[in-house]
Curated annotation (Swiss-Prot):
UniProt GO molecular function: ATP binding; magnesium ion binding; methionine adenosyltransferase activity
Region named Flexible loop: 101-111
Official protein name in the record: S-adenosylmethionine synthase
Domain of life: Bacteria
Cell compartment(s), UniProt: Cytoplasm
Residues that hold ATP according to the record: 17, 177-179, 244-245, 253, 259-260, 276, 280
Annotated keywords: ATP-binding, Cytoplasm, Magnesium, Metal-binding, Nucleotide-binding, One-carbon metabolism, Potassium, Transferase
Cofactor(s) listed: Mg(2+); K(+)
Cofactor binding note from Swiss-Prot or TrEMBL: Binds 2 divalent ions per subunit.
Swiss-Prot/TrEMBL GO biological process terms: one-carbon metabolic process; S-adenosylmethionine biosynthetic process
Gene: metK
GO terms under cellular component: cytoplasm
UniProt pathway: Amino-acid biosynthesis; S-adenosyl-L-methionine biosynthesis; S-adenosyl-L-methionine from L-methionine: step 1/1
């Protein structure tokens, strides 16, 4: 590798990873609530360990959800259906500890500071303040057709394929837990030129040999996913490098909602504000504003206004308007960053109520995001992945 080139690595995990089990359970409960109560306030946390699921958090809703039933159905869909896998949907214990949302928080969310002070009319604002303070990032680049960085895009596709070959009985000896990792080499112009390394670790039946796993995964997982032109004789493969991965899932490691925030976003390629997504309704700006920031960044790149774009939004609890908007195009912008911020303010309503309305976020759409990434998805229709504002942004920014 020449001195002007660099390597960058991102990872993903399968739906059977302990932390991802928790994300999916939390979002399954959220979706079940939103089906009958779109205005519910939900902050649902899940933890799993050997034979045990604990669901806790704050939920304010007018509907009823059978949480243990939802938990078991989710675990079953993932594939933990037999005790010998280390976790079983039918026999695991499910404990719940749910409270209502704090009245102090609800006061700020129900009526934004601007509405309480009379500085914005009822016609201007839906009177929803941010559910917490915080900063959120969104990112897009033109490395892939999904406008995502290549390392995380390939890592997700490998993880999804790992699950597909298990569920479709192509490789029936695989079990639900697994991880993937891709290292991409970039040239002096910051363009991806080759894959330097691929790492896959997958849980498996105890009687299968490492050689068979390595041969099968290369044929059925790596080759169908990774573009042939990015592979060369120096590409390194690490498939189950420990040699054995029989004990997995919650039996191998405890899991917790919100512990895979880099997998959920951009694989470390862009910055992260620290807030997790799963189990939170759209009044929580950790989730909704991160989706809005991706929506903004993707439309800027889709408009041809930048090759790479990172958007930061920041909020104060109980205040509707973002306290700051920042845009970084990494010297690839066709317009100044000040101009882009002006154009974004004119075309996107980034108040919590505005985001909810703009992206139609009071729907049960969240479980499908809880594994294989919240961004760059081609298999599901997610509103923040649309590029419907690209033309308007380009015309206003460039004066066309």
């Amino acid at each position: 590798m020449s001195k002007n080139r660099r390597l960058f690595t991102s990872e993903s995990v399968t739906e059977g990873h302990p932390d991802k089990i928790c994300d999916q359970i939390s979002d399954s409960i959220l979706d079940e609530i939103l089906k009958n109560d779109p205005n519910a306030r939900v902050a649902c946390e899940t933890s799993v360990t050997t034979g045990l699921v604990l669901v806790s958090g704050e939920i304010t809703t007018s509907t009823y959800v059978d949480i243990p039933k939802t938990v078991r159905e989710t675990i079953k869909e993932i594939g933990y259906t037999r005790a010998k896998y280390g976790f079983d949907a039918e026999t695991c214990a499910v404990l719940t500890s749910i409270d209502e949302q704090s009245a102090d928080i609800a006061m700020g969310v129900d009526q934004a500071l601007e509405a309480r002070e009379g500085t914005m009319s009822d016609a201007e604002i839906e009177a929803i303040g941010a559910g917490d303070q915080g900063l959120m990032f969104g990112y897009a680049c033109n490395e892939t057709k999904e406008l995502m960085p290549l390392p995380i895009s390939l890592a997700h596709k490998l993880a999804r394929r790992l699950s597909e070959v298990r569920k479709e009985d192509i490789l029936p000896y695989l079990r639900p837990d697994g991880k993937t990792q891709v290292t991409v080499e970039y040239d002096e112009n910051n363009k991806p030129v080759r894959i330097d390394a691929i790492v896959i670790s997958t849980q498996h039946h105890p009687e299968i040999t490492l050689e068979q796993i390595q041969r099968n995964l290369k044929e059925h997982v790596i080759n169908p996913v990774v573009p042939e032109e990015l592979i060369d004789e120096e590409t390194k493969y690490f498939i189950n490098p420990t040699g054995r991965f029989v004990i997995g899932g919650p039996q191998g490691d405890a899991g917790l909602t919100g512990r895979k925030i880099i997998v959920d976003t951009y694989g470390g390629y862009a910055r992260h504000g620290g807030g997790a997504f799963s189990g939170k309704d759209a009044t929580k700006v950790d989730r909704s504003a991160a989706y809005a920031a991706r929506y903004v960044a993707k439309n800027i790149v889709a408009a041809g206004l930048a090759d790479s774009c990172e958007v930061q939004l920041a909020y104060a609890i109980g205040v509707a308007q973002p306290v700051s908007i920042s845009i970084n195009t990494f010297d690839t912008g066709k317009a100044s960053e000040e101009k882009l911020i002006e154009v974004v303010r004119n075309n996107f309503d980034l108040r919590p109520a505005g985001i909810i309305k703009m992206l139609d976020l009071r729907r049960p759409i969240y479980k499908q995001t809880a594994a294989y990434g919240h961004f760059g998805r081609h298999d599901v229709d997610l509103p923040w992945e649309r590029t419907d504002k690209a033309d308007a942004l380009r015309k206003e920014a460039l004066g066309e």
